[in-house]
Amino acid sequence: MEMRALAQSSTVDFWHLRWEDAVAKGLRIIELASRVEDPISQASARRWVAITLINMGEPNRANPHAAATLVIAKRTRDQYVLATALWFNELLFSYQGDWEAAKVFSEQGLLLSPSDNRMVSSRMLLEYQVGNVAEAREYMERFVEGIQLLPPPPNYDQAAMALKIPLVVQITGDMDLLQIAENAADMVLSASSATPLVSQLARWGLALIAILRGDVKSAREQYSSLILGHTRFVVVSGDRVLGLLSQTMGDSDQAATHFEGALAFCRKAGYRPELAWTCHDYAETLLQRQSPADQAKIMELLEEGISISTDLGMAPLLKNVISLKEREESSLVRGTGYPNGLTEREVEVLRLVAAGRTDREIAEELIIAVRTVTTHVSNILNKTDSANRTEAASYATRQGLA
């Protein structure tokens, strides 16, 4: 009875973000299991200890529990329990960038349960990370179709959609997909049954949507909400999301603080794919700040990002990091020569502003994120002492830049 009660309590702790308690209770169940044969409680304890330690950035401690979960799950002959064990093992290796090991568990899980949205969405992200676009799209379609078939109320699967679709958009640039994620997030947050963890995942999704759209107002709203219950990692680094929100809000110093937190967490945990993305986003933020004091840090981040993404075969990210590095090297060699300290990229944006283009239209033409355009426009207004886009356009005409 004690094992069953602890198992139920540890599950509640996990979904309510009381992770230290979830681990402590799970370990107590494992201790009791040496005296009582109760595979269901053992499997529950092991899996919550495993996934909690994974999210806390302790994969070495999580690994034996994830492996034991799989052994015990096979003994239970419960399809859901086994699929969950396979999924946790897949996550453990994906977060560390061991794609081949992750795929082994993914294939087993999808063979066992082809419509399991957890397995499908994880595989979708994996394939997008390594640039297997055709395969990734197939998993995306399966994921979206699977979510549409779910009955109310919304649960983890809808929250995962709210979070994972924007992560896909960060890789592909397909902004039209964001509406799907936004609808899922709104559905989750309107449900009284949503647990704190599920609600937080939905808010992370809304945060990424605000970042990708360059929506400063929404970015401020999401930052204020997320900073109160700050969680370090679930699929993505919480500090990386907060750093990107800060960048969107125009606070580069605050962004740098969060990015440093994300770097420290990912390095300690060995979560190399997320570390590479953090290097990219941090470097881009410093590039936009345009301080000569940041140049050494920028190159250090870009070199690390290139090294990791090359080693892990993360082709889409590698392309983006190389592009940032070329921009930085070009600006160092050439300098700008433009008035008011405008950079070459800012002049490109200014010309399009003067032509009446919206931020999204500029982003599409220059093949950069909308949030990046928004930051450039803010820098342009400050440097040219312009109150709005119309005054900036007039400045461009006077200076012969348009």
Q: Which residues are covered by each model-predicted region?
A:
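Conserved small-residue packing positions in alpha-helical repeats and bundles
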Residues: 10, 50, 90, 124, ...
